[in-house]
């Protein structure tokens, strides 16, 4: 049986500011011409969990996504010097990199969010109207602080920590929405296909309505 899921690409945000060896906080200079605060970042580290995806498509994604993302961010008054795209050998490895702060944004399946220890913070999701306990029957939800067995299950998740200013969230959210709305951006993200995404360094706040970027078929 096939179920159609949407890959939600909205609410993109960066930065896990660790105490030791972390990069400096992003500069927050004077307001831009539209009244929004200009943001400057040296590097945005984005990691995709490889799974069973085609290696050639991932290499194309690695080459094609950075300039599109840079342009989308620039339109939101955000200047990023470098977008670094890496690939994790597994969802668990990518989730760990997110927790450790070596990755700012991670594209992951929802299982990686639910099983993350320490737990990642839930920010925004798509409601699939299925109780979490039915969707993940082998998970002990009593041990999870943010998800209950009777909660609606969320196939696509945005999560993060508490360390980044809220002001960054809206800018990256709009940038990724714009990227996914463009033909070029959508085509590039199609190279990855199925994934949820997690965001490091963001307080638990719903930033904008989630936006459908891709439609997937998942075998059951």
PLM features: residue spans?
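Acidic, polar ligand-binding/catalytic clefts
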Residues: 88, 92-147
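Extracytoplasmic small-molecule ligand-binding "clamshell" domains
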Residues: 37-114
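N-terminal low-complexity, Pro/Thr/Ser-rich intrinsically disordered segments
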Residues: 25-49, 53, 138-145
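Extended ligand-binding regions for polar small-molecule ligands
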Residues: 33, 63-73, 138, 142-220
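C-terminal motif of bacterial Sec signal peptides marking the signal peptidase cleavage site
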Residues: 16-19
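Positively charged n-region of N-terminal signal peptides that target proteins for export
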Residues: 1-4, 11
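Bacterial signal peptide processing site
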Residues: 21-23
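Ser/Thr- (and often Asn-) enriched beta-sheet segments in non-cytosolic proteins
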Residues: 40-45, 79-86, 121-124, 140, ...
């Amino acid at each position: 049986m096939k179920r159609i899921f949407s890959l939600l690409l909205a609410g993109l945000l960066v930065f896990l500011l660790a105490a030791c060896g972390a990069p400096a906080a992003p500069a927050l200079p004077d307001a831009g011409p539209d009244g929004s605060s200009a943001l400057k970042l040296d590097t945005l580290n984005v990691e995709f969990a490889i799974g069973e995806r085609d290696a050639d498509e991932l290499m194309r994604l690695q080459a094609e996504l950075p300039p599109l993302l840079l342009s989308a961010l620039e339109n939101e008054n955000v200047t990023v010097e470098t977008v670094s795209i890496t690939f994790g050998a597994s969802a668990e490895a990518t989730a760990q990199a997110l927790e450790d702060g070596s990755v700012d944004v991670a594209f992951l399946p929802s299982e990686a969010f639910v099983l993350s220890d320490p737990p990642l913070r839930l920010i925004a999701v798509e409601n699939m109207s299925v109780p979490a306990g039915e969707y993940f029957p082998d998970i002990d939800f009593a041990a999870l602080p943010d998800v209950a067995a009777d909660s609606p299950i969320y196939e696509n998740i945005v999560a993060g920590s508490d360390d980044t200013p809220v002001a960054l969230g809206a800018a990256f959210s709009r940038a990724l929405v714009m990227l996914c709305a463009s033909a070029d951006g959508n085509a590039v993200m199609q190279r990855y296909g199925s994934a949820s995404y997690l965001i490091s360094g963001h307080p638990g706040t719903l930033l904008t309505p989630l936006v459908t970027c891709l439609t997937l078929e998942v075998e059951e």
